[in-house]
Structure formats: C-alpha cells, structure tokens
C-alpha cells in the first residue's frame, strides 16, 4: 500500500528526513515513535500527501505521489486517507455531524447519504446525542471521536493519527487507542505517530526514528489479513458534486458573515452607497429627462418655425417678410399635420385703472396645440374668430395675474380689456406655463393673427410661420424639404428655420453627458467598495488559514477553496447591492414625496445593472484573496495559530 524509498526532506540547509525507506502493507497497525524534532510528523505528513519530499520516491496504492499535482493529492486524501490530529482540528462554526460530513461533501455524496453515514459513525462512537453540538460544547475525548468519525466518512483505508492522545486525559486516551485497534481489526491501515513507548506498544509494528533516520523497524507479529475496503471509483464532475460545492460554500459564507456582523456591514457600506448611487443617478437622470422631454412636447414637439432673415439677430430681417402665399404653400404639404401663422406687436393692455406693457400674439387656431398651450378657463380661438378678424383674446397666466389679481379665471370671461385702444373680449385664460426652460414675466394676449394685421399693425406680412410635422415623418427630412420648397418659391434663401427636435436632442445629449459623469462618480464609489471587500477578504483568509488547512487535509481541491472565498466575496457584494437597491427605493420615494418639480423614475435595468455589477465587483476583487487561499501550503496552513 505504501512504499517509500530514499525520502529526504530539507528545509533550507536543515535535513529533516534523511534517505528514509520503508513499506507498509494494507491492514497493518504501525507506530512511528520518536522524540520531538525527530522527523516523525514530517514523515507522516509526506505519507498523508500534505507535504512533498525534497527527493526520493513515494508510491501510494500504485500511484507515484511525487508526480501528482495538488488536486490529485487532494483526491487521494479525500478518497483513501483519514487524518486524526492531536488538536482535533474541527471547524468551530460547524456541528459535530457537519464536521464529520465535510469530506463527503468534497467527495460528491448527496445530502441524505452523507447525513446517514455521519449519524451512523457518531452513533458507533457513542456520540449520537451530540450530533448538533459545536466543538466548544464537546470535551476533548468527544472532539477526538468526532475527528475519528470524520476520518472514516469516505472509507478511510489509511488512518493517519498524529499524537491522537496527546491532548486527552488517560481515560479518553485509552478509549481512542481501543477505537484504533478495532478499526485495524476491521481492515483499516493505521499509522500512529507518538513519542510515548507505551502507546507505541499498542501497535503491531513499531518504527523508531531519530534525527530524520530510521533506527529500528520491528514487527511484533504478522499483521492480520482482514477485509480490504474497496477502492473508490474514478472521480467524475457530477451535478451532485457541483451542488455540494455551491451549497457548502454558501453555507460557510453565510456563517462567516454572521460571525462578523459589524465588519461585514462596514464592508458592505461601500457597495451599498455605490449601488444606491447608481440607481438614484439613473432615476434622477430619467426623471429630469422625462420632465424636459414632456416640457418640450408641450412646447411643441415635431415643430418647425420659419422666420425671415438669416438667423436670430439678423439686422436685415426687418426688410424680409413671409406672406400668406408661403403659408398656403406649406399647408398643401401632406407630411405636415398643422400649419399656422404667427405675428406679434407690443403695446399697452388696460383694464379699469390698471395698465401694463404687453404683447399681442397674433395666432391661428392650431397654434395653441402646436405650442402646447393649455386652457384653464373658457375656450381658445376658432376658425370664425380668425376668418372674421374678431376682437377676442385669450389671456396668458401673467396677463390674468396682473390685470385681475384677486379673481378666478372663470369669473373674468366676457370682460373687455383694451390693447392699444382696441377693445378685446376675454374668451379664455391659459394655465401657467411651467414647461418653459426659462420663466418670463411678459404679459401676453393671444388674438387672431388677422385681427392683429388688420386692426393693430396694418402689416399684411407674417413674422413667423409655425408647422407641426406628422409623427411618422422625420422632422429633419421635413425641415430640409420645407427649406428647398420655400427657397425655390421665393427665389432665394432669405429665411431660416428652427427645429424643436434640435433643442430636444441638445437637451437629451446634455442629460446623457451629465448622467455619464455622475455615473462615473458612482462607479468610483463601487470600486472603492470593491477594494474594501478585497481588504476584508484578505483579512478573512489570514484569520481562517487554519480552517483552509483543515479543509485541504480532508480532501478539498484548490477550486473548492477558491470557490468558497469567491462566493463569500460575491455574497457580501450581492447583499450590499440588495441593501443599496432598497436604500435607493426609499430615497426615490422620499424625493418624489417632497419634490414637485420632477419625479425620480426607478429603472429596472439600472437595478439589474447594479446587481450584476456588484457580483462582478465581488468576483474581481475577491479573486486575489481567493487565489491566495487556494495556493496555501496545507502544512503551513495547519500550523497557523
């Protein structure tokens, strides 16, 4: 079963083992005796594949161990070797049954099978009443019996016992030795390391070692031929194994987080703030953007204004005029939903003893809908008003507020106001326009543009034509077509256009830029949170080095250890992300309750992005600590206090 030839182990210039050669057959009970520093524990660690010899040959059950990689050695420990340590090496967060079951988890056995086997072993060792007890609730002898049960859960063809009675009282020590003798009688190969000749005398074969060399190897009697346990089948990556790995990792991660609540919360704080920032920034951006786009829609979405001149502020624009012929040409275009004229003039509005500087806006029937003007009381202009040049007016909010400060809108309908000595009957009052990007205090009276031209200015030319493009038509294409048609008709391009979509696109682009910049700040917060997670995970690896060594000793693969710490990092980040989302929901609710300007809009994609990014942060910043844990040397890890 075990064959060692010329095994040497050097640490620096010190020779721990010197050309050790021996063989151990299946079913033997061998005691390796020696004083402290003799090399007996180093030899046991090499036999148990926890340590690697500096030179020599080691064959275990027809496998040349010196040529196996770390995971292949872990498989040997998992399937064929069971360890009994002097200090028990039980995991403090697990119950007796869970400690015993742990090697079976890494072996891929299902929950029912490993639970039944663990209960049977503990029952056989008179611990049926301690299944759910934690190690600190057990006596030394009971802990050692749990350790023996753990060594047997996967079969334990070879049992390696390192000073198993060293920390026990005499009664418990005798019980442990009796258990080992009984296991040997059942066919288990036992290798016992001790410094006590009386304990060594219980074995059938004693090997004495001193200063790294074998002094004697005596067989007291021939080993009994007993039933040899079957070799476990070749390992396969089954679904059960993957489920076991994931479940065990989640359970340990959860226990670790609960065991250090304050530290875990402080670690999550960076993630919580980062995720809440991401969700709130997106919600703020969507809310403000929706408000602006709604305002633009009310101001006139898909609208194009045609004005004389080369552009805003053109001094020669006064010499250029648009006319009714241009208006009719545009009305004939089928891709335009509405076309109307717009002119204005300044003057004085008077009601009783109140006189104000005001502006008369000459508009058509469609202007109110095109510009998004909403009626508060009364009605808007109709076709008869425009056709007959009627002296009627619709007051805006500023006109109503200044001319009729203490009256309701519906109470002033039918009254007459003067504008530049012309009397106008009030037929409607507009709502306050809260959608304008910049609030102004201009007093406006909306009258038929025909009334303005015929009775106020005498000018038959138009200051502006405003059109609304159909929803299924590109406003840019429509604008280009209008420019070409009017340019051909007028013989020159002595006018300019303003497309509301240009303003809309500029606002959207500005909001997008602002959102990106703010999101960058949130991402930085996430990265800072991720660095905090990595720092805590490095501390966790350092604190749990001994636990890692124990898991490796009972057969955990490197990927098992790595997955354990990666899942813990991801779990911390995910819990932090969930708390961050919950916090952001409260913030959004509070903001929407208190703010009347615009709402914050919670976006499902931003929540999903936050959760996914937190997992990504967990993987990225948890990888380095997890890799460090997986690369630990089992012997160094086990010796860590």
Curated annotation (Swiss-Prot):
It is found in: Cell inner membrane. It is a multi-pass membrane protein. Keywords: Antibiotic resistance, ATP-binding, Cell inner membrane, Cell membrane, Membrane, Nucleotide-binding, Translocase, Transmembrane, Transmembrane helix, Transport. The keyword Transferase does not apply. It comes from the Bacteria. The chain crosses the membrane at residues 265-285, 519-539, 571-591, 604-624. Signal peptide: none annotated. One of its GO terms (biological process) is response to antibiotic. PROSITE patterns: ABC_TRANSPORTER_1 (PS00211), ABC_TRANSPORTER_2 (PS50893), MACB (PS51267). ATP binds at residues 34-41. One of its GO terms (cellular component) is plasma membrane. Residues 2-236 form the ABC transporter domain. It is an enzyme of class 7 (translocase). Its main location: membrane. Pfam families: ABC_tran, FtsX, MacB_PCD. Homodimer. PANTHER family: MACROLIDE EXPORT ATP-BINDING_PERMEASE PROTEIN MACB, MEMBRANE COMPONENT OF TRANSPORTER-RELATED. Non-canonical ABC transporter that contains transmembrane domains (TMD), which form a pore in the inner membrane, and an ATP-binding domain (NBD), which is responsible for energy generation. Confers resistance against macrolides. This is Macrolide export ATP-binding/permease protein MacB. It comes from Campylobacter jejuni (strain RM1221).
């Amino acid at each position: 079963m075990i064959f060692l030839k010329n095994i040497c182990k050097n640490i620096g210039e010190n020779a721990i083992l010197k050309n050790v050669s021996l063989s151990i057959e299946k079913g033997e009970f061998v005691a390796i005796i020696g004083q402290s520093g003799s090399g007996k524990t180093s030899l046991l660690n090499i036999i148990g594949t926890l340590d690697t010899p500096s030179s020599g040959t080691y064959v275990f059950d027809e496998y040349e161990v010196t040529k196996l990689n770390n995971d292949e050695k872990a498989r040997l420990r998992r399937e064929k070797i069971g360890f009994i340590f002097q200090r028990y090496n039980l995991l403090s967060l697990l119950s007796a049954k869970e400690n015993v079951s742990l090697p079976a988890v890494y072996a891929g056995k299902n929950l029912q099978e490993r639970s039944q086997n663990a209960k049977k072993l503990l029952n056989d060792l008179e611990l049926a009443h301690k299944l759910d007890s934690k190690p600190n609730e057990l006596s030394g002898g009971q802990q050692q019996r749990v350790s023996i049960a753990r060594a047997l859960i996967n079969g334990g063809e070879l049992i390696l016992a390192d000073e198993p009675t060293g920390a026990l009282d005499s009664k418990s020590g005798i019980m442990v030795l009796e258990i080992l003798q009984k296991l040997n009688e059942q066919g288990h190969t036992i290798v016992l390391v001790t410094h006590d000749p009386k304990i060594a005398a219980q074995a059938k074969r004693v090997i004495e070692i001193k200063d790294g060399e074998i002094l004697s190897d005596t067989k007291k009697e021939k080993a009994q031929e007993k039933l040899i346990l079957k070799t476990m089948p070749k390992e396969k990556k089954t679904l059960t194994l993957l489920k076991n790995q994931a479940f065990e990792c989640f359970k340990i991660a959860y226990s670790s987080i609960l065991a250090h609540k304050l530290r875990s919360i402080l670690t999550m704080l960076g993630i919580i703030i980062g995720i809440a920032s991401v969700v709130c920034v997106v919600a703020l951006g969507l809310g403000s953007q929706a408000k602006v786009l709604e305002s633009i829609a009310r101001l006139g979405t898909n609208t194009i204004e045609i004005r004389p001149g080369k552009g805003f502020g053109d001094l020669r624009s006064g010499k250029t005029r648009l006319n009714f012929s241009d208006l009719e040409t545009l009305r004939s275009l089928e891709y335009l939903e509405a076309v109307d004229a717009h002119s204005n003039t300044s003057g004085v509005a008077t009601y009783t003893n109140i006189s104000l500087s005001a502006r008369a806006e000459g508009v058509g029937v469609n202007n109110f809908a095109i510009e998004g003007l909403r009626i508060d009381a009364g009605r808007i202009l109709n076709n008869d008003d425009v056709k007959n040049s009627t002296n009627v007016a619709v007051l805006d909010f500023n006109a109503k507020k200044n001319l009729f400060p203490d009256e309701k809108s519906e109470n002033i309908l039918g009254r007459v106001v003067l504008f530049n000595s012309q009397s106008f009957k009030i037929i409607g009052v507009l709502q306050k326009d809260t959608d304008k990007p910049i609030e102004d205090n201009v007093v406006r009276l909306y009258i038929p543009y025909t009334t303005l031209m015929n009775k106020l200015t005498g000018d038959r030319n138009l200051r502006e034509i405003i059109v609304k493009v159909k929803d299924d038509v590109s406003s840019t294409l429509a604008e280009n077509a209008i420019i070409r048609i009017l340019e051909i008709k007028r013989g020159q391009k002595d006018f300019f256009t303003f497309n509301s979509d240009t303003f809309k696109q500029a606002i959207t682009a500005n909001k997008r830029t602002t959102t990106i910049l703010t999101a960058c700040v949130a991402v930085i917060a996430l990265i800072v949170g991720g660095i905090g997670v990595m720092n805590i995970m490095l501390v966790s690896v350092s604190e749990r080095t001994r636990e890692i060594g124990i898991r490796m000793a009972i057969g955990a693969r490197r990927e098992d250890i790595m997955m354990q710490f990666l899942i813990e990092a991801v779990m911390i980040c995910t819990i932090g992300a969930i708390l961050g989302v919950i916090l952001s929901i409260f913030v959004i609710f509070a903001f929407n309750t208190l703010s009347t300007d615009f709402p914050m809009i919670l976006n499902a994609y931003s929540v999903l992005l936050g959760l996914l990014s937190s997992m990504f942060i967990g993987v990225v910043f948890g990888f380095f600590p997890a890799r460090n844990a997986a690369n630990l040397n089992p012997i160094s890890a086990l010796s860590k206090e």
